[in-house]
Regions:
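Acidic, surface-exposed loops and disordered segments
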Residues: 1-88
Length: 88
């Protein structure tokens, strides 16, 4: 779960950028991943609050995104696109 300060204007954007970089690195290592944007709701729940307390994270932080990782089952292929536009 990606957390950021509650009273910082760019917390959500910072977490999104950090999450994107984590997913790019994971992909380069052959690990698949997905970023889920339910962090606020999850961490605001009773379960989320208990988890933050258990991990020693104070209430000045809130969740923004979750990242799940795993190894893809088989190889993935990207279909060739003929309609690409190049600027240069």
């Amino acid at each position: 779960t990606l957390l950021g300060p509650k009273n910082f204007l760019y917390s959500e954007a910072d977490c999104a950028v950090a999450g994107e970089n984590m997913l790019l690195m994971a992909s380069s290592l052959g690990i698949g991943g997905c970023m889920i944007s339910r962090g606020k709701e999850t961490m605001a729940s009773e379960y989320g609050q208990a988890l933050l307390k258990e991990k020693g994270i104070n209430d000045n932080y809130q969740g923004f995104y979750h990242i799940i990782l795993g190894y893809p089952q088989g190889k993935t292929f990207v279909k060739a696109r003929k309609d690409r536009v190049y600027y240069g």
